[in-house]
Amino acid sequence: MHIIFHPEDEMKKFINVYIKSDYDIVILRLSVIIIFMLFGTYKWFDFEVMALKPLISPTWLNILYIMFGVHGGSYFLGIVETITFLALSIGFFRPAAGILGDIIVIVTGLVTLSLLPQLGKVDSFVIKDVLLLGAGSVLLKYDLKNYLNIKN
């Protein structure tokens, strides 16, 4: 007895499994978690504190420096980013926590992009937030659907 392998059938199976799965959302959530975990952790180190200074000082976000000092402003951002990645992580199991994380991702993107007119230039620190707006919106829709289904 010969078993004939048909790669096109295997590909169709894979595609059907993928379409019916949540793999895309899991990958997206993990990607955003990693971004916020890295950037949130960096905010506690001098290299990041100093890298942020020329980006924040000439903008309205300078209020953080006025309130907390240069290091304190960076630490504040680190705390917000840590809360974000923790909420997104818990969101795997608790959609309400995911919703909180998603909203912070969107707000973070909006806040960072609002700095563009004052910075007068586009750099990677700011432009990544265009993608985060989209990712946060997709995750928010997913978590809202899950939250409402759990409540019904």
Labelled PLM ranges:
Residues 2-83, 87-152:
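Membrane-interface extramembranous regions
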